[in-house]
Design a protein with these regions (language model features):
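Membrane-interface alpha-helices at helix entry/exit sites of multi-pass transporters
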Residues: 74-82, 155-162
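Hydrophobic alpha-helical transmembrane segments
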Residues: 3, 25-26, 55, 80, ...
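Small-residue-rich segments of transmembrane alpha-helices in multi-pass membrane proteins
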Residues: 28-40, 62, 83-95, 162, ...
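Transmembrane alpha-helix boundary signature
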Residues: 38-47, 70, 92-105
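Membrane-interface interhelical connector segments
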Residues: 97-121
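Transmembrane alpha-helix/helix-exit interface in multi-pass inner-membrane proteins
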Residues: 81, 85-104, 130-138
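Alpha-helical transmembrane segments and their cytosolic interface
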Residues: 136, 142, 148-233
Length: 233
């Protein structure tokens, strides 16, 4: 699990370094689609039941926090809207594939149906929860930012507070709403509650672990801006 966090979170910095803001928008689309496929799989991690897509879902909060910190609230909301649009398009495409009549030699359609027959409910639940929670996360991030600036007189300091203050609350809402919307009637109530508890424990860990990556992203951006300014002089 820790290796997954390091690879996925590290990938956000690579996308930022190579492609800039557009790279983070691209990463949002990739993470949104992949997480909604992975979430079908329930695994045992650290002795608890959890869905496999937790780290990828958490990475979308990391991306919006990085964008909020570097580029601003408007750009962060754009990332959220891209994630929603990506989910909507993927729902349509994944269901369109299932309408085709496979050839006699085909071997993939049964597996595709197994995966994507559950996709609409999961994706719609995810899309609605994502829209609500990510909008809240962006709003909360900037509310924390305004509060720390007013309280301590610095707009640069206390990144860790606005990052974790917004993400931990948002992750709880995301976990609770999505798990019940996606798995009610699919798993037992006991399993759903176990998923909620275990997933939030994981989300707490992933939320705390993403803070250094936000600091690194800000430092990378600041370094790039200095290079641009040096070239212009």
């Amino acid at each position: 699990m820790l290796l997954s966090v390091l690879i996925i979170y590290g990938s956000t910095l690579i996308f930022l370094k190579v492609f800039g803001k557009q790279g983070l928008y691209c990463f949002t689309s990739i993470a949104t689609i992949a997480a909604n496929i992975e979430v079908l799989i329930v695994i045992i991690a650290f002795g608890m039941e959890m869905t496999l897509g937790n780290v990828l879902f958490a990475s979308t909060f990391l991306v919006t926090d990085i964008i909020s910190e570097i580029y601003g609230k408007k750009e962060a909301k754009t990332a959220v809207h891209i994630g929603i649009a990506t989910s909507m398009l993927f729902i349509v495409l994944s269901q369109w594939w299932l309408l085709y009549t496979p050839a006699k030699s085909d071997f993939a359609m049964p597996a595709m149906k197994t995966i994507f027959s559950n996709t609409p409910r999961l994706m719609i639940a995810s899309m609605l929860v994502y829209a609500i929670v990510q909008e809240f996360d962006v709003w909360a991030y900037h509310k924390w930012w305004d509060w720390t600036e007013k309280k301590f007189g610095s707009r640069y300091k206390f990144l860790w507070l606005r990052n974790n203050g917004s993400t931990l609350i948002s992750q709880f809402l995301n976990n609770l709403l999505f798990t019940f919307a996606a798995f009610w009637g699919v798993h037992s109530v006991k399993t759903i509650i176990n998923i909620v508890i275990s997933s939030y424990v994981i989300f707490i860990v992933t939320s705390l672990l993403d803070t250094p990556f936000v600091y690194l992203a800000r430092r990378m951006h600041k370094s790039e801006m200095k290079k641009v300014e040096a070239k212009q002089e």
